[in-house]
A protein has these predicted regions:
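Helix-to-loop transition at the C-terminal end of transmembrane segments
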Residues: 24-37, 166, 266
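A conserved hydrophobic secondary-structure block that centers on an alpha-helix together
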Residues: 121-147
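Membrane/wall-proximal cationic-aromatic binding patches
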Residues: 32-116, 366
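Serine-dependent acyl-ester chemistry module
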Residues: 107, 159-301, 319-322, 357-361, ...
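Hydrophobic membrane-insertion alpha-helices, especially the h-region
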Residues: 10-25
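Histidine-centered active-site loop/cap adjacent to the catalytic His
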Residues: 8-10, 236, 310, 325-365
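Proline-aspartate-enriched helix->loop->beta-strand connector
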Residues: 146-155, 159
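Conserved beta-strand elements of the Class I
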Residues: 89-93, 126, 154-156
Length: 366
């Protein structure tokens, strides 16, 4: 009997040893690849964002693996309160489509836009985008933080589908309390565990459909949008207009960018899973998600005409090009390069038309 007990006791010890070995290996990997101290905590939310009395923003000099933020908490070159004489400072406001982590950090489309602009005058691109930020959050971020750094131009690449979430975007209250720094023993091995994406496609589709059905069943009839919700679209238009007014009120000029997606007008079999994933975070059917995207882009173009704001039609250039998207809306490296080049052309053209009092370069060559 005793030998059997000893044999059973070996299993917990073995499991603990395997997990401990995996954790040690993960920390050594981070040390070698990213120069992260072995005993330091590693948390993307804490390491890259900070809460102050007015907003959530990028953490000054934040770093997470390959990501490095500057003194303003932006992804960009060294920054001072004002741009260098004769230089055009360009700020980018957006959500997760505008930032990249992991090994691809540094290949965000704003970084590639910077490279495309380097031979066309003195430009400084500062990427202030934060994952999950909708228009109200971006407006507060602009008013309370980004505007202080006096950009001349502001690229706005916002996510219309946020307006199809169960709760519509609202202007946030000031953050309460400071985020707590994670303990040094917070596991890093968990982040390396394979996620849902590693499952067979048929299983991923089943999970997505199950989640959608559960969400619909948990609400009254009519909760799921069967057509483009006029009130949500109007809210998007109003919030976008408010951001434009705020940017111009601070002395900068906005550049609006229509939102691109992988889905063409004619759906392909390979699109089914990605549309289910996108739909899962909303209260709309798949076709309505796509229709809302197109309606929001049309609304942005109309706003640009009404306000005299430059609108870059990225959707016309990138939408439907499956090879330029890693999922439903996030770009591959080639997609980011196309986006960066497209925006560089527009930024250079607009910079060449603005008066020199806006701290613009006299060497700009559209």
């Amino acid at each position: 009997m005793l030998p059997r007990v000893r044999a059973w006791l070996q299993w917990p010890v073995l499991i603990v040893a395997i997990l401990a070995g995996g954790e040690i290996a993960a920390r050594l990997d981070d040390l070698v690849r990213y120069d992260v101290p072995f005993l330091a905590p590693l948390d993307v939310g804490y390491d890259l964002t900070v809460r102050d009395s007015t907003t959530i923003r990028g953490r000054p000099f934040g770093r997470f693996k390959k990501v490095r933020l500057n003194a303003a908490g932006f992804r960009g070159p060294t920054v001072t309160p004002a741009a260098r004489a004769g230089c055009v400072r360009v700020a980018v406001l957006g959500a997760s489509e505008s930032v990249v982590g992991g090994e691809a950090a540094g290949t965000e489309y704003p970084a590639l836009m910077q490279r495309a602009l380097d031979g066309r005058g003195c430009f400084e691109v500062q990427n202030a985008a934060l994952s999950g930020f909708d228009l109200p959050h971006l407006t507060v971020l602009w008013n309370q933080w980004v505007a202080r750094w006096s950009p001349a131009l502001v690229v706005v690449y916002t996510t219309p589908a946020f307006y199809l979430r169960p709760d519509a975007p609202t202007y946030p209250d000031p953050p309460t309390g400071r985020a707590r720094k994670p303990k040094w023993w917070t596991p890093r091995l968990e982040d390396r565990a394979p996620g849902e994406w590693s499952l067979p496609e048929v299983v991923q589709k089943w999970i997505a459909r199950r989640d959608i059905e559960r969400a619909v069943a948990a609400h009254d009839a009519g909760w799921e949008y069967q057509e483009v919700p006029a009130d949500r679209l109007a809210r998007y238009q109003g919030d976008l207009d408010s951001l434009v007014v705020a940017i111009r009120g601070a002395g900068a000029e906005p550049i609006l960018v229509t939102h691109a997606m992988r889905f063409a007008d004619a759906m392909r079999p390979s699109d089914e899973l990605e549309l289910l994933k996108w739909q899962r975070g909303t209260r709309a059917t798949g076709p309505v998600v796509l229709a809302f995207e197109r309606a929001a882009n049309a609304a942005m173009l109309a706003l640009g005409r009404r306000r005299g704001v430059m609108v870059v039609d990225a959707a016309a250039r990138l939408t439907g090009r499956q090879e330029w998207f890693v999922d439903y809306i996030h770009f591959t490296v080639p997609g980011r390069a196309v986006m960066g080049a497209l925006l560089a052309d527009s930024v250079a053209a607009l910079a060449g038309r603005l008066p020199p009092t806006r701290a613009l370069s006299d060497r700009v060559t559209p």
